[in-house]
Regions:
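Metal-dependent de-N-acetylase/amidase catalytic core
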Residues: 81, 94-103
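Hydrophobic helix-and-loop "lid/oligomerization" segment in the mid-to-C-terminal part
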Residues: 1-28, 48-49, 66, 100-253
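Hydrophobic, small-residue-rich alpha-helical packing segments that form membrane-like cores
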Residues: 1-90, 107-109
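Hydrophobic, well-ordered secondary-structure segments
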Residues: 39, 88, 92-95, 117, ...
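Catalytic-loop motifs flanking and including active-site residues across diverse enzymes
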Residues: 86-94, 168, 251-252
């Protein structure tokens, strides 16, 4: 897997990331939650001999990327009835389609919990298929075989508790997102992929520590922003743009 570094790489599919992956011998690139506007980037990957499959849930532009396949419910020619899947929901659909009807139930049982967490964390419209994904995924979270997820639940104080979408949004998601915000995005992925219980415990503790660091940085930025507002004369407050060279890019965005 490759997760773009928020500060160094920016968001979405980037040429530097494509070149790096090509150098590692990657010949098939599957995007998740990005790439629908990456026409030039996908063309660049093609020029390097890479096949690209784009999965995304953002609105399409007039020109689609020249990928082998573009999976997005917002495609003008897509007849899929539910248009509000999260990026992880679209990825789940691809997994189910590739697995075939005979494996659909097994794959859904394994991956629905991760899709539920992603859907709730992305604050998607909680209706129709999203509601089904979240309801089923959270109902089976205690039976999930993802060791890293159980380690994170334990470290977050949610072991042996009924996990709701609210707890996903305010407890689990901030810890998972903290890795990317603080410049260590791979840590969250490594945790979810981890098969060693001891390493999973270590990564979960590190992730929670990063989240506490993120909270402290965020609070400091907030205090400085309030100070800037208070120093601005009332007659100049009709519209305010606050900035500082010292504010952490991963936290303000």
């Amino acid at each position: 897997h490759y997760i773009p570094r928020r500060i160094e790489d920016g968001y979405g599919l980037g040429r530097d990331a494509i070149l790096s992956l090509h150098g590692q011998g990657v010949r098939l690139l599957v995007t998740v939650d990005c790439g629908i506007t990456g026409v030039e980037e996908v063309a660049y990957a093609n020029s390097l001999g890479m096949d690209v499959v784009v999965t995304d849930h953002h609105e399409c532009k007039e020109e689609l990327p020249p990928a082998c396949a573009v999976v997005d419910p917002h495609r003008p020619d897509c007849g899929y009835p539910f248009k509000h899947l999260a990026g992880c929901g679209v990825a789940l659909k691809l997994v189910l389609a590739l697995g075939g009807e005979s494996r659909e139930e097994a794959l859904l049982s394994r991956y629905c919990t991760l899709a539920a967490i992603g859907t709730a964390a992305d604050v998607m419209q909680m209706s129709d298929e999203n509601r089904t994904i979240v309801s089923r995924g959270l109902a089976s979270i205690s039976r999930s075989d993802f060791i890293g997820l159980h380690a994170l639940l334990h470290e977050a104080g949610l072991s042996d508790k009924t996990v709701t979408s609210v707890q996903i949004g305010f407890v689990l998601a901030p810890r998972i997102n903290a890795a990317g915000r603080m410049g260590a995005a791979d840590m969250a992925a490594d945790l979810l992929l981890c098969t060693d219980p001891h390493r999973a415990e270590h990564l979960a503790r590190e992730l929670c520590a990063l989240n506490r660091e993120r909270q402290a940085v965020e609070q400091e930025i907030y205090s400085q922003a309030v100070e800037q507002i208070e120093e601005t004369p009332p007659q100049e407050r009709s519209a305010l743009v606050l900035a500082s060279d010292t504010w952490h890019q991963g936290v303000v965005g």
